[in-house]
Regions:
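Amphipathic alpha-helical segments used for helix-helix packing
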Residues: 85-107
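Short, charged helix-capping/linker segments at alpha-helix termini
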Residues: 15-16, 128-133
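Helix-turn-helix
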Residues: 4-47
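Short, basic, alpha-helical segments at the C-terminal edge of helix-turn-helix-like DNA-binding modules
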Residues: 49-55
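Short helix-adjacent coil turns
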Residues: 67, 104, 155-156
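Hydrophobic alpha-helical connector segments
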Residues: 59-90, 138-141
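Amphipathic C-terminal alpha-helical segment
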Residues: 142-159, 173-178
Length: 178
């Protein structure tokens, strides 16, 4: 159900997610959803956002040993797959939680973005970017990629992701101490 919730949130936002619909899709009684998620929809949304966050953090950490170009590409490719598989109907559920009507989800989105920031900062520092600059660049990577996901959805094209990755790679390369 958590994976299903993440998909619904990515496509329609937090408000589109319904426990009843997810229970029907999963083929489980509605009561069992409240057994597993006693805090209801809010808990399921937060767990879905944390799951996606952890998956992306793991991708960044695994790619770190292959260099920042690979890290940037892996980060963008994660969202490219989501966009293309959904025919550009879905984006990032973390971003959806960040702008949700219910402010309870903002804290979880902030935690996930902080995890991505930390993983990207480490990858950038490992590649020779000075520590202070690495933190700022990591935030730029997250912001630019999230923006590119929105642009890609609107244009129904992955071109914004490609352009952002190319520009970020140039920016990172120029930030390395030589």
């Amino acid at each position: 159900m958590v994976v299903g919730a993440a998909k619904v949130i990515a496509a329609g936002g937090v408000d589109a997610m319904s426990l009843r619909e997810l229970a029907i899709q999963a083929g489980v009684p509605l009561g069992s959803t409240y057994h597993h998620f006693p805090d209801g929809k809010a808990q399921l949304v937060d767990e879905a956002v944390r799951l996606v966050g952890a998956q992306v953090t793991q991708l960044i950490e695994e790619a770190r040993t292959q260099g920042t170009d690979t890290v940037l590409q892996v980060f963008a490719d994660r969202w490219r797959r989501v966009l293309e598989v959904s025919e550009y109907a879905a984006g990032c559920p973390v971003a959806a939680a960040a702008v949700a009507t219910d402010p309870r989800h903002h804290d979880v989105a902030r935690e996930v973005f902080a995890d991505w920031h930390a993983a990207l900062t480490k990858a950038l520092r490992d590649s020779g970017v000075p520590p202070k600059r690495a933190g700022r660049l990591a935030r730029t990577v997250v912001a630019a990629t999230e923006g590119a996901v929105s642009l890609a959805r609107a244009s129904r094209s992955s071109a914004p992701l490609d352009e952002v990755v190319d520009e970020l790679a140039t920016l990172v390369d120029s930030a390395r101490t030589r």
